[in-house]
Amino acid sequence: RRYDGARPLGAIKSTILALLYLVIAALFAAIGGMYIASLLGNTKFFMEFALFRGVKLTFVLPIILVIIAYLQRFPLWNGRMINSKEEAKTFVVEFLTMDVKLYVFFIIAALGGAVWVFVGRSGHTAGVPVPGFELMLRRFLENTMYARPREKEFIIGHPALMLATFAFMRKWPTVIHFLLTLAGVIGIASMVETFCHLRTPVFMSIMRGYDGLLIGALFGVLLIIAVRFMMYVTQWFQAREVDHE
């Protein structure tokens, strides 16, 4: 959908649409995940004569595609969209030759650390170690729910995707729902990644995604309510300051 300047939707309608779009995205993720699972249902993968090396790609590629889609549909770069080869070449040249402040390196380092953690903890091989408090949370979820949902889905991805949709419907600045969408893609990519575990039954992967979607949707609604409350409080204090002046 192209960027437009239409009036923002109401808060309740925006929240309902945020929940609806999260469910739709989760359904697409489940379809893609089951397709991958069907491809892996082969003796050579179970006997480990062949290894599936696309686990980390299922996590990284959606983020790259979202960045490209945003650059094509929203005026993110210098107030313009990038829809042709010439515009893409101009973007690359401008991006590589732009002035960079020192604080940008700290931001890049922080983002690089986050990417290292998320990508390193995906896949079948040992990567970034899991902290103790998260192991306790996992144990609690395993004992409480039918299938333990993934933390990056219901804590980060799904709530962020709902807030991104809410931000878009409410006509917040584009950069806000862009960053939130990048965070939201983590949850959707994680759902696809769940089906890449060879020895996990498909039904368990479906239930794991469903449990994560259920809790993530609840957290997303609570996050939207919390953000709305903070905005009302901020506006109230600003109005009081204006009255005192």
Cite the ranges covered by each PLM segment:
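Alpha-helical transmembrane segments of integral membrane proteins
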Residues: R1-E245
